[in-house]
Regions:
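Short alpha-helical elements
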Residues: 1-203
Length: 203
């Protein structure tokens, strides 16, 4: 049934947030894109080359909250600009979070088009820049921005998401939702360890 994956995703997302003692909808989202290689047989008409990352395949865009829960997903040809993914993700986030959504964090790959689109939706889009003091230190995670990178890493553990196998981008996006649903169902059905469990593990 069309949209079933997204309806289940939204239902479980609200439950996970409530369990974490948060309101159903976030006031802040983090947006990022990741280029994923396409498997042999995936139509060339739905893929492209990310010239910056030298990846031939598709670009997967995510909008997540501070708990790492997915708010929006978009799958495009890897040749598409980050702005195209960013504006689509802002639209999804605004639709699903309503007036409560106030701010979105993006990296320096997103340009003025995304900031302007956010302003039209009454969302403050902040470009998170690297701290000059961190230059030369190697990889330094950026607070909050790192959350969406963790989500991307978790999704890559799912075999069907490690590469782009699907002929249609909307099917690929649906697989992201189902992977997210599986992760949230695990969160909701795994009891939180009590102090007794901790003592048992220590023993």
């Amino acid at each position: 049934q069309d949209g079933l994956d997204q309806r289940i995703q939204e239902l479980l997302r609200c439950q996970v947030r409530e369990r974490a003692r948060r309101l159903e909808d976030p006031s802040l989202v983090i947006i990022d894109t990741q280029s994923v290689r396409a498997a042999a047989g995936v139509p060339k008409t739905t893929t492209g080359l990310d010239a910056n990352k030298k990846v031939s395949g598709r670009k997967r865009g995510l909008a997540v909250d501070v708990l790492g829960l997915i708010i929006g997903v978009v799958v495009l040809a890897a040749s598409a600009h980050d702005n195209t993914a960013g504006t689509a993700l802002l639209d999804q986030a605004a639709e699903r979070c309503g007036m409560r959504l106030e701010k979105a964090l993006v990296d320096q790959g997103f340009k003025d088009e995304v900031l302007i689109h956010g302003a039209l939706l009454d969302i403050d889009v902040e470009v998170v820049r690297r701290n000059p003091a961190d230059q030369g230190k190697g990889f330094v995670p950026q607070p909050k921005r790192w959350i969406v990178e963790q989500v991307n890493g978790t999704l890559m553990l799912h075999r069907r998401l490690a590469r782009e196998y699907d002929h249609r981008p909307d099917t690929s996006a649906s697989r992201v939702y189902w992977a997210s649903i599986a992760n949230m169902a695990r969160r909701l059905t795994t009891p939180a360890p009590s102090w007794r469990d901790t003592l048992g593990l220590a023993a």
